[in-house]
Amino acid sequence: MDSSAKTASAPDPFFAGTLAEADPEIAAAITGELGRQRHEIELIASENIVSRAVLEAQGSVMTNKYAEGYPGARYYGGCEWVDVAETLAIERAKKLFGARFANVQPNSGSQMNQAVFLALLQPGDTFMGLDLAAGGHLTHGAPVNMSGKWFKVAHYTVRRDDHLIDMDEVARRAEEVKPKLIIAGGSAYSRPWDFKRFREIADSVGAYLMVDMAHFAGLVAGGVHASPVPHAHVTTTTTHKSLRGPRGGLILCNDEALAKKFNSAIFPGLQGGPLMHVIAAKAVALGEALRPDFKIYAKNVVENARALAESLRGHGFDIVSGGTDNHLMLVDLRPKGLKGNVSEKALVRAGLTCNKNGIPFDPEKPFVTSGLRLGTPATTTRGFGVSEFKQVGGLIAEVLTAIAQAEDGKAPLVEAAVKEKVKALTDRFPIYQ
């Protein structure tokens, strides 16, 4: 046999080689991250653990395909199979949330919100959103964000006494500034949103109502949180967080004329070719959320959050607004004499992953903070229940109480002991075996 025949029959390492063979450094980083996820308790409210099916779809050959446009109207040939995937994602999103129209192409939560601005606002227009310091989001008008640079922003906030949104104040503010858009939703607000009242306020001043349900979309899908879709002109959400899918965005609405504006804003307004492998993974996750067991998951997320909040309160910690009705909570560390940055680092050393977070009217800078944000979606996914989250509350209290008594904010013996307890817990609930 000649050499050319041998070459033709030999596997091409470009297609057959493993990641470990092709790039051992990245392979090692991925292996390390898998180990971290397996052996730490994930309490970051915006994170979750996707199914192996979602991982498989996102790592599929659909990453190779360019598909500018929308199903049935592409600027490239060969899109018949990615059209199938995107159509499935669209139809599943519509069914899951009871919306007439859905755009599954946004690459991120920031881009989905930017698309709404592009479709509905002109530079210099006024909109309202919850202040970041009160639990809002960067894309809702923070001065450092595009939304705060290109538009006039009139923030509303929470009351000092109970840290709840004062809807009468929202109405007064709207009447004062006459916004073109009002945003409901945030990244660190643990209580219900009055979508009906927000829509009434928006209608009273001729504004659009946008609800960013990125954090609680999975709870809406699971039927344990009120849906904004019947009330909002447009609803946006990420597909990760409590929805438990790949990282990306989603736009929902019930008005055909607005849907066309949002489609044009995404493509060609903001994006070119969509990430078809991610859209395929979105379809998988949306399909999972349509199954009966997802309702059980969503119910457990909320029950676990309440159990964690009550456990922490039982150990003498203050919870902003007194508790939670969704998947997250803010811990006010000031009564313990602690800062968020120091507390986050100590908990991470103990295997309890969380993030420092500002609390309403926080006197500290954003990289210091007086609080911690804790969430239950990821650890609920791996099987933790109420009893485990009560234990987690005790472990958090153990670490924070120890560092509060230490001059340097470190308690290595306690942190190491808690880390062993964390490992024992996570070993009972393995992932990706």
Curated annotation (Swiss-Prot):
Function of the molecule: Catalyzes the reversible interconversion of serine and glycine with tetrahydrofolate (THF) serving as the one-carbon carrier. This reaction serves as the major source of one-carbon groups required for the biosynthesis of purines, thymidylate, methionine, and other important biomolecules. Also exhibits THF-independent aldolase activity toward beta-hydroxyamino acids, producing glycine and aldehydes, via a retro-aldol mechanism.
Gene encoding this polypeptide?
glyA
One Gene Ontology BP term is: tetrahydrofolate interconversion
- So which residues are the signal peptide here? none
Q: What is this protein called?
A: Serine hydroxymethyltransferase
Q: Where in the cell is it found?
A: Cytoplasm
The major lineage groups are: Bacteria, Pseudomonadati, Pseudomonadota, Alphaproteobacteria, Hyphomicrobiales
Which reaction equations make up its catalytic activity?
Answer: (6R)-5,10-methylene-5,6,7,8-tetrahydrofolate + glycine + H2O = (6S)-5,6,7,8-tetrahydrofolate + L-serine
In terms of superkingdom, the source organism counts as Bacteria
Q: Which organism is it from?
A: Nitrobacter winogradskyi (strain ATCC 25391 / DSM 10237 / CIP 104748 / NCIMB 11846 / Nb-255)
